[in-house]
Design a protein with these regions (language model features):
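Active-site Tyr-X1-5-Lys
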Residues: 139-164
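Substrate-positioning beta->alpha
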Residues: 148, 179-180, 196-216, 223
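N-terminal Rossmann NAD(P)H-binding glycine-rich loop of SDR-like oxidoreductase domains
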Residues: 2-22
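Mid/C-terminal beta-alpha module of Rossmann-like enzyme folds, strongest
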Residues: 211-279, 295, 300, 309-318
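Conserved Rossmann-fold NAD(P)-dependent oxidoreductase catalytic core, especially the SDR/UDP-sugar
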Residues: 93-141
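NAD(P)-dependent short-chain dehydrogenase/reductase
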Residues: 160-165, 169-202
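Conserved catalytic-site region of short-chain dehydrogenase/reductase
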Residues: 79, 115-125, 171-177
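NAD(P)H-binding glycine-rich loop region in Rossmannoid oxidoreductase-like domains
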Residues: 47-93, 101
Length: 320
């Protein structure tokens, strides 16, 4: 039996769908309050849904009954300052519990981390799996939670766990809707006026799912892989989206000081309204930083060729 945690989320649902399309009958976890993803509705007969929470060990024990493979896609994600410590605690403790249970039962795991947990490369070089985030200087709650969760998997591997780790860049796809990375497309459609100088990696959600499944089917263990379809300057990305949506592309450069003003304003508004800020300190500053990711390790490991980012952008725009 194959288990997918976090299957109601953007990536988890795609992993579940890909597994079903390959002829598998799978088990997926969901919290009691979570809704079934629309993309999985046609495959209800092939999916055994169970109520489970990574913070509830007993529910995980039941979910893991008869399981031989786990795709761990579950994570608590929030930009709210008040959620920073709970997010770190939840993601790390939940991962640690799952790691221990899988290790005890001889279950193979593919763990979803993030490039947020990967460090910086020297100027002019691409970021690889050999770079590591410095926990003594990092302040972003999400990055810390991903780094410390990944460290729990490395602990498990040292204790005998059969596992690999994937570090996706920004995952995009039509099924995101207007949530998560879908906000980028929604913002451009509604009339984005400014762009930043930064560069970041993007990858199709289907490619991430396919890479995870391909890795699961190998005998590779104790490795991490950056999953990146291509690097894009934000200006280029916004222009591609705008052209696809037949709207005006942003033409004004948002300088770093302007981004500082933006995140502070968003934080103040979020404090007044109790809502998540549209942009936080970390993402505001990252928007002006050049981060290019090297995907050669995963391509070599499984012989994978990524879908062009431009093709995914077109698909998302056509579905909007």
């Amino acid at each position: 039996m194959i288990l997918v945690t976090g299957a109601t989320g953007f990536l988890g649902a795609e992993v579940a769908k890909e597994l079903v399309l390959r002829g598998n009958t799978i088990r997926c976890t969901k919290r009691a309050s979570s809704k079934f993803p629309a993309i999985l509705q046609p495959y209800a007969a092939q999916i055994d849904w169970v109520i489970a929470d990574l913070m509830n060990e007993d529910s995980l024990i039941d979910a893991l009954d008869g399981v031989t493979q786990v795709y761990n896609c579950a994570a608590f994600v929030s930009l709210k300052a008040a959620d920073k410590e709970p997010m770190i605690r939840t993601n790390v403790k939940g991962t640690a519990t799952l790691v221990d249970l899988c290790n005890d039962r001889g279950i193979r795991m593919v763990h979803t981390s993030s490039v947020a947990a990967v460090g910086e490369a020297p100027a002019g070089e691409q970021i690889t799996e050999k770079h590591h985030l410095d926990p003594t200087t990092e302040t972003d709650g999400y990055a810390i939670s991903k780094l410390e969760s990944e460290m729990e998997v490395w602990r498990g591997i040292a204790e005998g766990l059969d596992a690999v780790i994937v570090n996706p860049t920004i995952i995009i796809g039509a099924s995101a809707g207007t949530a998560g990375s879908g906000q980028i497309f929604d913002t451009v459609r509604n009339g984005l006026k400014y762009y930043t100088r930064g560069t970041i990696g993007f990858v199709d959600v289907q490619d991430v799912a396919k890479c995870m499944i391909a890795l699961m089917e190998t005998d590779i263990s104790g490795e991490r892989y950056i999953i990146n379809g291509g690097n894009r300057a934000y200006k280029q990305l916004f222009e591609e989206i705008a052209n696809c949506m037949h709207v005006k592309a942003p033409a004004k450069l948002a300088k770093p000081w302007m981004m500082e003003v933006a995140w502070r304003g968003a934080a103040f508004w979020g404090m007044l309204t109790g809502s998540a800020p549209a942009i936080d300190k970390t993402s505001a500053r990252a928007a002006s930083v050049t981060r290019n990711f090297d995907n050669s390790k995963i391509k070599k490991a499984i012989g994978f060729e990524f879908r062009p980012v431009s093709d995914t952008i077109k698909e998302i725009c056509q579905s909007a």
